């Protein structure tokens, strides 16, 4: 499903757009994708092509996220997508983050279904995990806001490489973060090798 992103700027001189979801700030030509391979420039508009497409759905102990002091002893409904805004050589989820075009098993799911699944499996929260959730912001936000209305807490397991605009939106619906510190360097682009 194609969904237009609200976090991009149009170029006044060309059909390029600048994605403002993550800190890569990809400049994307018409018909091309950003680093995450989830956002495409179509005629000068930025579209998220991954809305409702997930790689994984599991009820996990919250300690697997790992969070130890947030809802201890409960289950969280873990949801993963495809793609990533980094290119870590040691990625434990490489197939869903970088080689996902080779995976034919893709789940199309509605935000309401994720919330219903979480509740029916006895989960107290939804965790956006397995790949970088920030690149799926429109879907995650819609699902999370529905979940919060049903008293589910929201968890983001992230590399933290997001724009301040995206962070502002995420803070509207996230209750707990696990920021996986992957790399540090004086140069911000050193950690994103793609």
Residue ranges and their predicted role:
Residues 183-190:
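Conserved small/polar residues in nucleotide/adenosyl-binding loops
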Residues 2-74:
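N-terminal juxtadomain amphipathic helix
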Residues 180:
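Catalytic-face loop-and-helix region of soluble metabolic enzyme cores
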Residues 192-194:
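N-terminal low-complexity segments that are often proline-rich with Ser/Thr-Pro
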